[in-house]
Amino acid sequence: MSKQFILAIDQGTTSSRAIIFDKKGNIKKIAQKEFTQIYPKSGWVEHDPMEIWASQSSIVREALEYARVSPRDIAAIGITNQRETTVVWDKNTGQPVYNAIVWQCRRTSHICDEINKNEDLKKYIRKNTGLIVDAYFSATKIKWILDNVDGAREKAEKGDLLFGTIDTWLIWNLTKGEVHATDFSNASRTMLFNINTLEWDKKILEYLDIPVSMLPEVRSSSGDFGHTHPSTLGGARIPIAGVAGDQQSALFGHCCFEEGMAKNTYGTGCFALMNVGDKPVFSDAGLLTTIAWAEDGKPTYALEGSVFIAGAVIQWIRDGLGLVRSAEDSEYYATKIDSTDGVYLVPAFVGLGTPYWDMYARGTIVGITRDTRREHIIRAALEAIAYQAKDVLDCMKEDTGLDWAGLRVDGGAVQNNFLMQFQSDILQSEISKPKINEITGLGAVFLAGLAVGFWKDKEELKTILTTEKTFEPKKDPETVAHDYKGWKKAVQRSMAWAE
């Protein structure tokens, strides 16, 4: 057996995963391990970087062992990761100076408020990074660590500290410190990377007082990120050849290679991306402009809409409210009634993303009457996921003038047929669910496989992806418009709540 497999390292917000694929895209083995979510204060979210590395390395070894695959049988590794989450570590010891500050964390909202008072800087950041100023992105998280961790700024100015998003942290550990690099897609989510010049932006770095020496080298998403150190994976030196942030990786996994193709991923958050080609398109409707991936140093751009809370609202009604015993139960209860009877749940637990960008919005349930039951709340939670996706996808149509012949979907929540049908109804569009649900991991191995010749070209990749189920709209446009109007009203109730 020689080089018959390719490995995806899929490091997510709540779990570390390893997926072994064969050349036909079949999954040989998936291994997964959850890790600790740390909430030091209201609105703060952290992870332990050492626990992330320990969980990810152990789960890779477990996947290989259970699949009876030798590390030497792996042609390459593709890495995909939760984006924006920020790690700062000492390059001499390899030890983090603080916990990883997670993308969901709102602790730097006050820094963003100060930036937003500077209209010229705010516009500069929008035009050159493609992002809006928000605590979501890495830039202000790095500044917070440098300003609040004892000795961090002094060490950084001496050149002793390194920054990385999770991909960079994993690459550093896999290579035992030989490679400090990221890819274009992850770099474009830091609010420090100029997507026009394709370099770290000196003006933003200077304003935030972040030394450029901390930042990783930016490389093509499909290409050379070094090899695993023999001590990390059973003595083998496996090429790390594909890297992309989770949402961009999913776009690649869906084979959305042409301009105008779009996908929506339903995970902890909800993320829609549309391929807009080889030149950035800037949004008038609150969408982010981002780099989807880069090959041979040439980027493909995308528009993205980010919803902070999607699948996490189902976790909340299960764990927080105890309304269901499992996520799967939500579909059962939602289909026991014909509608929510005017109940809307807006899951703005950590603010609202696209197109509202309100850091101070908070969750709300409206329309409750004496007749409201468990089923109405559960159904409203599921519908909220679809409504938020519609908010984003409508903006994409508006900004690009492009429509799509259907939408490609993936993520844990696509197993919920009620949600997918409701999504098709309110979009008045076809929804396609692929047979392979591990699209994010597939995108990472597609990028890695192209780099090492495991697959020859994108046309071959398209033959691997097949559709399992298609959802067609069943509701009439008038009903959809009425229900969506109620959603927009509910969103207004949730906004500008926190201080």
Curated annotation (Swiss-Prot):
Top-rank taxon, per record: Bacteria
Residues reported in the UniProt entry to bind sn-glycerol 3-phosphate: 13, 83-84, 136, 246
Positions bound to glycerol: 83-84, 136, 246-247
Activity regulation: Inhibited by fructose 1,6-bisphosphate (FBP).
Positions contributing to ATP binding: 13-15, 268, 311, 315, 412
One cellular component (GO) term of this entry: cytosol
GO biological process, one term: glycerol-3-phosphate metabolic process
Disulfide bonds: none
Catalytic activity: glycerol + ATP = sn-glycerol 3-phosphate + ADP + H(+)
EC identifiers of the protein: 2.7.1.30
Pathway recorded for this protein: Polyol metabolism; glycerol degradation via glycerol kinase pathway; sn-glycerol 3-phosphate from glycerol: step 1/1
GO MF annotations in UniProt: ATP binding; glycerol kinase activity
CDD domains in the cross-refs: FGGY_EcGK_like (cd07786)
Classification via InterPro entries: ATPase_NBD, Carb_kinase_FGGY, Carb_kinase_FGGY_CS, FGGY_C, FGGY_N, Glycerol_kin
Keyword Mitochondrion assigned: no
Positions annotated to bind ADP: 13, 17, 268, 311, 412, 416
SUPFAM superfamilies: Actin-like ATPase domain (SSF53067)
Keywords: ATP-binding, Glycerol metabolism, Kinase, Nucleotide-binding, Transferase
Protein's job: Key enzyme in the regulation of glycerol uptake and metabolism. Catalyzes the phosphorylation of glycerol to yield sn-glycerol 3-phosphate.
Similarity remark: Belongs to the FGGY kinase family.
Protein name per its UniProtKB record: Glycerol kinase
Protein's organism: Francisella philomiragia subsp. philomiragia (strain ATCC 25017 / CCUG 19701 / FSC 153 / O#319-036)
Gene: glpK
